[in-house]
Amino acid sequence: MRPYEIMVILDPTLDERTVAPSLETFLNVVRKDGGKVEKVDIWGKRRLAYEIAKHAEGIYVVIDVKAAPATVSELDRQLSLNESVLRTKVMRTDKH
């Protein structure tokens, strides 16, 4: 298993109280495959550097996970299929 940092930018029209419960359904993919969700950091609504899908703001969420590469690919695929997710970025962190 490798450590990853996943940044997700969500639609700003979502209620911020529903962000964590809706992310849990996606994070269950990691847990089901034997991975570990180490941290979920919800930054809240921030201004975007440029418009994405006609939105100037987005709700930023940073997730630290330890999982297999195939599991992270599946998580990224499922997030990108969700209409409320504007953008995702997956980075492998090399914490020794």
Swiss-Prot record:
> Which PROSITE patterns does the UniProt record give?
RIBOSOMAL_S6
Tell me if RNA-binding is a UniProt keyword of this record.
yes
What this protein is reported to do is described as:
Binds together with bS18 to 16S ribosomal RNA.
Under the heading InterPro entries, the entry gives: Ribosomal_bS6 (IPR000529), Ribosomal_bS6_CS (IPR020815), Ribosomal_bS6_sf (IPR035980), Ribosomal_S6_plastid/chlpt (IPR020814), Transl_elong_EF1B/ribsomal_bS6 (IPR014717)
Give the matching CDD domains: bS6
Q: Among the record's GO biological process terms, what is one?
A: translation
**What is this protein called in UniProt?**
Small ribosomal subunit protein bS6
Q: Give the taxonomic lineage as stored in the record.
A: Bacteria, Bacillati, Actinomycetota, Actinomycetes, Mycobacteriales
Organism source for this protein? Mycobacterium tuberculosis (strain ATCC 25618 / H37Rv)
UniProt entry keywords in alphabetical sequence: Ribonucleoprotein, Ribosomal protein, RNA-binding, rRNA-binding
Its family remark reads: Belongs to the bacterial ribosomal protein bS6 family.
